C-alpha cells in the first residue's frame, strides 16, 4: 500500500537547488522524510560544542491546516559524527511560509565539516490532532498510572 500524497508548496531560495543539487527528495520508496541539503557557499566546520543555523535554500508552505512538518536529524550524522539538531526537533506549523533553516550542533569530540549541498536533516510531514482540554480532579486508572522515567525498566 502506498502512502497518501499531499502537496507541499516550496519556494526555491537558492538557485543551485534543482540544478547543482536535487530538490528535497525521498532517498528510497519507503522513506518517511525528505532529505534537506545545506545551502552553503563554502564548507563550514563545526568544532565540538558549536551550533550554527544553516539555510536549506527553500521556503515551505504546507497549506493544509491538518498537517505539520518536523525537521529531524539524519541518524548517520548523529551516530557517527555527533552532529544533531541544535533544537532537538524543529516543528513547522501549516501556516508558516518562511525559509526553512536547520540548527546543527556538534556534540561530538571532533570537528566536522559540512560541504555545500550535503544532506543535513530530513523533513517529515505529519497529520495533527487538535485537542480540547478537559480539566478533571482524577484520571481513570491505567496500567501504568503515574510511573515515569525508567518505570518499565530496560529488560
UniProtKB/Swiss-Prot annotation:
Keywords: Hydrolase, Magnesium, Metal-binding, Nucleotide metabolism. The lineage of its organism: Bacteria, Pseudomonadati, Pseudomonadota, Gammaproteobacteria, Lysobacterales. It catalyses: dUTP + H2O = dUMP + diphosphate + H(+). Its cofactor is Mg(2+). The keyword Disulfide bond does not apply. The keyword Transcription does not apply. It comes from Xylella fastidiosa (strain M12). This is Deoxyuridine 5'-triphosphate nucleotidohydrolase. Pfam families: dUTPase. GO terms for biological process: dUMP biosynthetic process; dUTP catabolic process.
